[in-house]
Amino acid sequence: MSWRNQGITGSNNIPLGSRRRFAGDGEEEDGARSVTPSAPSSVTNGDRDRDRDGPVYSNDRDVKRGRSPERSEDGPKRRKKRNRWGEATENKAAGLMGLPTAIVANMTSEQLEAYTLHLRIEEITQKLKIDDVVPADGDRSPSPAPQYDNHGRRVNTREYRYRKKLEDERHKLIEKAMKTIPNYHPPSDYRRPTKTQEKVYVPVNDYPEINFIGLLIGPRGNTLKKMETESGAKIAIRGKGSVKEGKGRSDAAHSSNQEEDLHCLIMADTEEKVNKAKKLIHNIIETAASIPEGQNELKRNQLRELAALNGTLRDDENQACQNCGQIGHRKYDCPEKQNYTANIICRVCGNAGHMARDCPDRQRGASWRNDGPGAGRTAGRIGSSGGGDAVDREYEQLMQELGGTGAAPARIEAGPGSFSNGPSGGNGDAKPWQRGPTGGPAPWRTRNMDRDHEGGPGGPPSGPSGGPAPWARDRNERRHDDRDRGDSYYGGDRRHDDYGRGSSGGGGPAPWHQPPPGAPSAPAIPTAPAYPGAYGGYPGYGAPPGMGAAPPPGLPPPPPGAPPGLSGPLNALIQQYANAAPPPPPPAAEAPPPPPMDLPPPPPPGA
């Protein structure tokens, strides 16, 4: 087959050989060419693509494959790329300002900053005037996706975006210059915007498990309203996820922002309000992202507020545990074991959880031990000493001020620290059984103390004095005490005379036993001695005639004792009245009238 020897394959008429790609047209056919090998990095790929047809390379068929030829020096040079430090003539606004940019004078940092602000404001103003807002092609950023309004017109064109960017920058610079430069006046064509808007994006993609919208809005929107009140700016949540699924919103503001990421739109009339609102929003976002959900105090307060609005709030959530004293759980849910410290009761203030020496209500310098004059007192009692609860002491002080008296009220409790046994008694620290006699009257003598001091009906006051005990006094004295006590109880008069007692109250005989004036005194009637079991001072009772007295002359004496056959109580009764004196005779007075006659009454007259 002759076609194999021709060096062609099929329809390809290009002969196989070592001919290089960049061969000149005027090269010699004998293959004797001069080549200059060079490094592969001397000519880049971009240079080859741009200068493929123009430059002339000195190549040879025998050059090794993989080696890039070197561009000859007589070829055309590539145009140098423009850098950021271009010619001054390229900046049209700089030529119109007429302000120097090369500063050779000595200026402070404040002056330099003020001049920079003024220069940049003038530059932006000139660019807006001549409509030079779009930068060069090399300085432009990638264009965003186009957006259209309701009429189908594009709203985010290149000119609109750059003009708005320059206007926002000039507005911020003018606000800053008015604060730093004294007597600064903005440009004549500057119109202060009625509202300043700024967006704060929410990191929902970084923390998908956190409900940022719920934390920002709060229960019934109260958290968002509170931030608006504190900052003075209007805050709105826009972007993806701001509207719940299934709710169709016809608002153009919501529909136009659904393609953006979730963000907070802040609108205010001043920059300070916007910055304050941004700070509040960042605080909520950083707290939710850095603190676990169970320890987030903002969420706890929001849940508590929501429960209060729904009427399901339990008011015992802030109560301390009775076992450990911590807040957040009850005693039956306490994770700790039994705490003995919580069961200790302070004797100074009466509260639990600390001892008396650690009590904050204890007076400075006062002893915390139970050995003072007011020892033994329980906490909370009203007293004149320094102990007790602080509330009780304040109440005592208030009552003293209202009453106008400077003396502290007396203590009302009994015991070693009571009023009668206080430090003034001298035995306040001793036990009751260790104290000596007080020198006061016995309890049964203090019963009629007031009567003795006021004076009885029969003499001057005698005062409390030592006397026999109630069981050692005779019956007359006890009857006297009972009568006086009864009269005083029932409003009676103690000055009246009872039967058998004179007005003088003395122990003399009865009036009918006294002889008339001027008559000789009658001999005393001998009385029998009292029976053996009688009290001292009690006279014996008289016996009937023929039993206790001496028999008349001529009669034999009666038999001693009771008649035979009598025993028991009757015998004792007879023995009691055997030797008693006879009863007194009746008083000397006129004889009673004679009894009526037994004759029948006379007939009536005229019978």
Swiss-Prot record:
CDD domains: KH-I_BBP (cd02395). Its main location: nucleus. One of its GO terms (cellular component) is U2-type prespliceosome. Residues 373-389, 534-545 have a biased composition (Gly residues). SMART domains: KH, ZnF_C2HC. Residues 521-533 have a biased composition (Low complexity). Residues 1-15, 35-45 have a biased composition (Polar residues). It is found in: Nucleus. This is Branchpoint-bridging protein. The gene is bbp-1.
